[in-house]
Design a protein with these regions (language model features):
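Flexible loop linkers connecting adjacent transmembrane helices
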Residues: 48, 82-109, 135, 144, ...
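A structural-propensity feature for long, helix-poor, extended segments
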Residues: 69-80, 299-324, 328, 346-375
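Short helix-coil transition sites and intra-membrane helix breaks within transmembrane domains
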Residues: 33-43, 81-92, 124-128, 266-276, ...
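Helix-loop-helix hairpins and the membrane-proximal interhelical loops
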Residues: 1-61, 193-299, 384-385, 401-407, ...
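Membrane-interface alpha-helices at helix entry/exit sites of multi-pass transporters
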Residues: 59-63, 100-117, 290-302, 330-333, ...
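Re-entrant/interfacial helical elements at transmembrane boundaries that shape
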Residues: 41-52, 65, 80-100, 131, ...
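Transmembrane alpha-helix interface/packing and boundary motifs in multi-pass membrane proteins
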Residues: 26-42, 71-84, 159-164, 261-270, ...
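Membrane-embedded alpha-helical modules
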Residues: 112-227, 341-495
């Protein structure tokens, strides 16, 4: 139920003086820069600038950190579209169709689609948060480790179906990725798959591996090309085409709405967030489309699905932070630290006692959406010029960027070595028709799946009947089976219903 008195107080907090808004534009710019730079994480940006929030009041601090979050969510899609390097794991699906659009000379439209989808996604996400923060937090509390494991398996199954007729290859790639993701210490302190190498005790660095498999392996294919976009006329940066991308995104309202709801609800699950939601949204959009084979070849619906879910995930993770005091991921973990610095404890009591502050944070993000649109439009033409750079300069530049970013993440040569090794792995997967995205997602979710499975085993005492007592788990497992066999069953029934003479 909406507290109208708290709404009035929230508006007073935001608009009585201009000071809360002084930090929003710098925050969005910081987020855009960190999100658009491969190897730099949104949570890293927030952590670096966290000490500055000591000199702000709580509302101003939240506006600053959420502005970084908002800018970074869009920024991570820019290198995914222009260079096939997702700035963060939340932009993996953006690269599936965004990069092919750029290769076709539609980089301006692709960036416009991404910006419009991000803007609408943030707006939709915080609107859902405003209306549903309390019931949403109650639903999240119902999800235990068994449900988490089922969600991860379902997500992996959906990613595998991206291969269409090569589903088995997709499943195999995802399974191998999950095995790689479990290398290192497990929850019980046991080391697995390290082959005696101490640098693997902490596991394979996922972000450098992702850079290698997506970006560096793609460079092998482009080595004999002159430019990313071969046509000189198509390499021009045109504001009019960026606005065409804006209009294009709005023509797919159901894709935006579906991505928005997937982003909010999956983003609200701690530890899952936008890394999974953008992929689930992409796969669901492809599955429901009249021409699923066009995805992965430059279909703008793929960019819309990914970016809308990616952006609304922010609101979902904020729901668990505000309503339960539980961070949904790295970015909201930094926000939780800001809560502690200002002697604030998130949770049901916080919502009841400081509803005006909660509403102020939500309303401020409505305004941030329009600032993101303006700043994004100024930012895009600058970055879109990358398609004008000859490949003889771009390939070494991207490799140096990937190597430097990976070194910054690990602090030693493990990161650069991981990039190069997984570049070869990515090239081999592409060459033999296996799904690179499925392998990467398997790596991202492998440790999470193992942790959830172990906790489920400990809670149930090894009793499989425990699953039968969890209706949500059964529903998710049913969805998993539908995603695997649903289309085959539909086709079978259609054949049965056709007259014999037809």
């Amino acid at each position: 139920m909406i507290d109208l008195a708290a709404v009035e107080q929230a508006l007073a907090l935001l608009f009585t003086n201009f000071s809360p808004w002084m930090v929003v534009v710098p925050g969005i710019i910081i987020g855009l820069i960190f999100g658009a730079t491969p190897g730099l994480q949104i949570s890293m940006a927030m952590a670096i600038f966290l000490p500055m929030t000591l000199y702000m009041d709580f509302v101003q601090a939240m506006l600053f950190l959420t502005a970084i979050f908002t800018g970074g969510s869009f920024g991570s899609g820019i290198p995914a579209i222009l260079m096939n390097i997702p700035g963060t794991s939340s932009a993996i699906a953006t690269a599936f169709d965004g990069y092919p659009m750029a290769r076709q000379g539609k980089h301006n439209q692709a960036l416009g689609v991404a910006l419009a989808s991000s803007v609408i996604g943030v707006l939709m996400g915080y609107l859902i948060l405003f209306l549903m923060i309390q019931p949403l937090s109650f639903m999240v509390l119902k999800l235990g480790p068994a449900e988490m494991f089922a969600v991860i398996l379902w997500g992996m199954t959906l990613i595998a179906t991206l291969r269409g007729e090569h589903m088995l290859k997709g499943l195999m790639a995802g399974f191998v990725g999950m095995l790689v993701g479990t290398i290192g210490f497990n929850e019980l302190g046991m080391a697995r798959g390290t082959m005696g190498q101490t640098f693997l005790l902490d596991g394979v660095p996922v972000i450098p591996a992702m850079m290698g498999m997506f970006a560096a392996s793609e460079l092998f294919k482009l080595a004999n090309k002159g430019y990313i976009v071969e046509s000189e006329a198509s390499r021009k940066v045109k504001i009019s085409e960026i606005f065409q991308g804006f209009k294009m995104a709005v023509t797919y309202p159901w894709v935006l709405i579906r991505g928005g709801f997937i982003g909010v609800f999956v983003g609200a699950v701690p530890g899952v967030g936008s890394s999974v939601s953008n992929l689930l949204s992409y796969v669901e959009t492809q599955r429901r489309d009249k021409d699923p084979s066009s995805f992965g070849k430059g279909n703008p619906k793929g960019v819309v699905a990914s970016e809308s879910a990616n952006s609304t995930s922010e609101a979902g993770s904020m729901a668990t932070l505000l309503a339960l005091g539980i961070p949904g991921g790295g970015a909201t973990a930094v926000m939780l630290a800001a809560f502690a610095m200002h002697n604030i404890t998130g949770g049901p009591q916080f919502i009841r006692q400081q509803t005006d502050v909660v509403y102020a944070i939500i309303f401020a993000n409505f305004a941030q959406v329009f600032l993101l649109m303006v700043i994004g439009l100024l930012f895009i033409p600058l970055l879109a010029n990358i398609v004008k750079v000859p490949m003889r300069y771009l390939i070494p530049s991207v490799l140096v960027l990937a190597v430097m970013g990976s070194f910054g993440l690990t602090g030693n040569m493990t990161g650069p070595a991981t990039v190069l090794i997984f570049a070869v792995v990515g090239w081999l997967l592409r060459h033999y028709g296996y799904s690179v995205p499925a392998a990467v997602i398997g790596m991202l979710l492998g440790a999470m799946a193992e942790k959830s499975l172990l906790h489920s085993y400990q809670i149930s005492g090894g009793n499989l009947a425990y699953v039968l007592e969890r209706p949500v788990t059964l529903i998710i497992l049913a969805l998993l089976l539908i995603s695997l066999f649903g289309q085959h069953l539909v086709n079978w029934f259609r054949r049965r219903r056709q007259p014999l003479g037809a």
